[in-house]
Regions:
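Conserved SAM-binding strand-loop segment of SAM-dependent methyltransferases
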Residues: 89-97
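Mobile active-site "lid"/loop adjacent to the S-adenosyl-L-methionine
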Residues: 115-146
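Class I S-adenosyl-L-methionine
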Residues: 1-86, 90
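A short acidic, Gly/Pro-enriched loop at the edge of an enzyme's catalytic core
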Residues: 102-112
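Conserved Class I SAM-dependent methyltransferase catalytic core
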Residues: 75-77, 138-198, 209-211
C-alpha cells in the first residue's frame, strides 16, 4: 500500500481509514449479492436511481444492469479509490453516508447495501438537531442510523434492502427504531441469514436481510 501512496501522509491516512472500517464492516459474499438482486428483480423492482450507502468495492452495483444513475458512498479511503477505478460511470463519494446532501432526500428508487453495524456513533447535524427522539437516538448505533437515513433518501414507494445485524430485529433497545420503521414503511421481507455467512471474513455474526418499501 505504501508504494501506491503519493507520500507518507497519504499512506498513514489509508492505514487509519482501514483500521476504522475494520470495526464495523464485513464485506459481502458474492452468492448473497446474487440472491438479493435476483429477488429484487422478481419483485418487479427496476430502479432508475440506485444508492449504495456503504459500497465497499462494489459487489452490489456489479450486478446492476441498465440503471441510468448509480450513487455510492464508501468511507474507507483506499476502498473508495478502488471502487472509483472499477466503476468510473458511477457517482462515488469517498466519505461517510452522513455527508449526503439534502438534495437527495426523496430521490432514489432503491437503496441497497451490506451496511456497517455496531455501537459506533455517527454525527449528522440534521439528526442531532431533530425533535424526533428516534432520529436523534439512532446516531448512537451506525446500523440504526443507516436505516433512517436510507429511508429519507427514498421517494414514496421506493425499496430499501439491507443486510444488517440481527440486533435490529431482536434487541429490546432497538424497539423504537423498529416502531419508527413500521410507521414509515411496509415490510416486504425479513430473512435470518446463516451465522457462518461471513466466515471468509474471519468472523461469525448473526445477520438479517431486511427489505422495506417506503410508505409515509
Amino acid at each position: 500500500m505504501r508504494e501506491y501512496s503519493k507520500d507518507e501522509t497519504e499512506y498513514k491516512a489509508y492505514v487509519q481509514s482501514l483500521k476504522k472500517s475494520a470495526l464495523t464492516a464485513f464485506y459481502t459474499p458474492e452468492p448473497l449479492v446474487a440472491a438479493m438482486q435476483e429477488s429484487l428483480q422478481v419483485s418487479g423492482s427496476h430502479p432508475g436511481r440506485f444508492l449504495d450507502p456503504s459500497a465497499g468495492t462494489g459487489m452490489f452495483i456489479s450486478r446492476l444492469k441498465d440503471v441510468p444513475e448509480i450513487h455510492c458512498f464508501e468511507k474507507d479511503k483506499l476502498t473508495g479509490k478502488i471502487l472509483s477505478s472499477l466503476y468510473p460511470e458511477s457517482r462515488v463519494t469517498i466519505d461517510g453516508f452522513q455527508s449526503i446532501q439534502p438534495y437527495y432526500n426523496n430521490y432514489f428508487d432503491m437503496v441497497s447495501s451490506n451496511i456497517p453495524f455496531g455501537n459506533t456513533r455517527v454525527y449528522d447535524r440534521d439528526f442531532d438537531r431533530s425533535e424526533d427522539v428516534v432520529r436523534k437516538s439512532s446516531l448512537a448505533a451506525v446500523h440504526n442510523y443507516f436505516f433512517l437515513k436510507g429511508m429519507d433518501t427514498l421517494h414514496e414507494g421506493g425499496i430499501l434492502a439491507y443486510i444488517t445485524t440481527s440486533g435490529v430485529m431482536d434487541s429490546p433497545q432497538n424497539r423504537p427504531v423498529r416502531e419508527w420503521l413500521v410507521n414509515h414503511a411496509n415490510l416486504v421481507s425479513a430473512i435470518r441469514l446463516p451465522d457462518n455467512l461471513f466466515v471468509d471474513a474471519g468472523t461469525e455474526v448473526s445477520s438479517d436481510l431486511i427489505v422495506l418499501q417506503k410508505n409515509t
